[in-house]
Amino acid sequence: MIVPIRCFTCGKPLGHLYITFKHRVLAGEHPGRVLDELGVHRYCCRRTLIAHVEWIDDLLVYEKRS
């Protein structure tokens, strides 16, 4: 999937936070602490960022056949 721009439940803009969140978690920081520091406190918004899986690179490998 493509990075979520807004929370699916409440509509809060999240797209600008995703790259920072991803880099910090991959660097070894605790996801909950990163979200707290980014100001993401609602459960619905936290779920949107934590549960997101990037599949777009895997899907682009397949060709469309006519």
Curated annotation (Swiss-Prot):
Compartment annotation: Cytoplasm
EC number(s) stated in the UniProt entry for this protein: 2.7.7.6
Pfam annotation, one family: RNA_pol_N
Keywords: Cytoplasm, DNA-directed RNA polymerase, Metal-binding, Nucleotidyltransferase, Transcription, Transferase, Zinc
Highest taxon of the lineage: Archaea
InterPro entries: RNA_pol_su_RPB10, RNA_pol_suN_Zn-BS, RPABC5/Rpb10
GO BP term, example: DNA-templated transcription
Cofactor: Zn(2+)
Chief place of localization: cytoplasm
Residues forming coiled coils: none
Catalyzed reaction equations: RNA(n) + a ribonucleoside 5'-triphosphate = RNA(n+1) + diphosphate
A cellular-component GO term for this protein: cytoplasm
Cofactor binding note from Swiss-Prot or TrEMBL: Binds 1 zinc ion.
Record-listed Zn(2+) binding positions: C7, C10, C44, C45
GO molecular function, one term: DNA-directed RNA polymerase activity
Biological role stated in the UniProt entry: DNA-dependent RNA polymerase (RNAP) catalyzes the transcription of DNA into RNA using the four ribonucleoside triphosphates as substrates.
Family stated for the protein in its record: Belongs to the archaeal Rpo10/eukaryotic RPB10 RNA polymerase subunit family.
Assembly information from the UniProt record: Part of the RNA polymerase complex.
Protein name: DNA-directed RNA polymerase subunit Rpo10
Organism: Pyrobaculum islandicum (strain DSM 4184 / JCM 9189 / GEO3)
